[in-house]
Amino acid sequence: MENKKEPIFIFDLDQTTIDSTHRVGHGSLTSWVRNATRKNIMKDKLLFLSQFISILDKHGYKVIICTSRVMSKWDWEFLYSKMNIPSHVKVIHRAEGDTRQDDKYKNTRLAYLNNFIQYKNRWKVLIDDREDVRKAFSNLGRKCKAWDIPKATEKMLSEFWVRG
């Protein structure tokens, strides 16, 4: 059961909880899409922070995944079969054709956490590898903060590793 007084944790996927660098190809969006086959997606590797999605959920925290990916059926298969994401965890993902910069996209999609009364007074913690995304999220509201991977790792280990 969700503890409504505790912070809300928002996790990015690529290079934060999942290593998908083998799919980058030449670095273009076209290359990324071409490499987004089931075979390649199933080669993605889980990063250390990925385990905390389930640990935090188990301890009653609201956990959200917010990715800039356009999710394919194989991405969903990976989340549920390899990452073992609980089915009730909200996954915010990009719609086909959405070309906004990642920081603007994520801020727009996560703004409800700062506006809706049930979330407004709770701390929101975004964990993302991208500095521009973290900075934009931190500016979303006074109860919005963002952690890079080293800080998130340190916090998760000190707060939840012993309990996990």
Language model feature labels by segment:
Residues 2-100:
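Alpha-helical substrate-recognition element adjacent to the catalytic core
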Residues 7-8, 106-131, 137:
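Conserved Lys-Pro-Asp/Glu-containing loop-to-beta segment of HAD-superfamily phosphomonoesterases
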Residues 19, 93, 100-101, 105, ...:
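Short, solvent-exposed coil/turn linker segments
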Residues 62-66, 111, 117-120, 145-149:
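Generic alpha-helical hydrophobic packing signal
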Residues 77-85, 112-115, 135-141:
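Short, aromatic/basic amphipathic alpha-helical patches
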Residues 100-113, 158-164:
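Short, surface-exposed amphipathic charged segments that create phosphate/polyanion-binding patches used
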Residues 121-164:
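Acidic, Mg2+-coordinating phosphoryl-transfer loop and its flanking beta/alpha structural elements
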